[in-house]
Amino acid sequence: MSFDSLDLCPELLSAIATQGYTTPTPIQAQAIPVIFEGCDLLAGAQTGTGKTAAFALPIVQMLSEVNPRKKHRIPRALVLVPTRELAAQVSEQMQNYGRRLSLRSTKIYGGVNIRAQIERLHRGIDIVVATPGRLLDHAERGTIKLSEVEFLVLDEADRMLDLGFIDDILKVVEYLLLTRKVTSSTKALENKQKQKVL
């Protein structure tokens, strides 16, 4: 199988080729078509298997195809991650793919000055990669709008649960429009948390 067979646009195929990749990994080959179909997805893959590209590529492409860019951009994709290090890594990949399709992304996490994050959000962002706590901080301050989020990704969800982020994640979902994707993700988390308690 090649990346050409995954219905990716020329801009993203070029980005992939620039990175030196020629063949999709198993997680990419399985996940990308499912995401393109608009289905919810629960997937697991080890670090280094191309997991981020598996969700980033189809999301970036679909964001560029639907809802033409508005003058003032509001986030339409949200990726929650457990740590600032992972936020930086995922955000970098989102930027690499998104810039080829004129999409803007940013990372949001604690331990740094919030003012610079507020300024970036104010300029308009399509994709936000965030840790749950700092995202909630922005939501409660009113410095981020989550009403138009179409895609929610919980990256390393098990680790977020292990770190005790379940309540924060559920609060984040309260700020989102309750689409099928969000509701399904929330139910899965609630069930997982119940299993951990039992």
Question: Model-flagged regions — what are they?
Answer:
Residues 29-41, 52-71, 88, 92-97, ...:
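Walker A/P-loop NTP-binding motif
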Residues 145-154, 158-198:
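Post-DEXD/H (motif II) to motif III coupling segment of the RecA-like Helicase ATP-binding lobe
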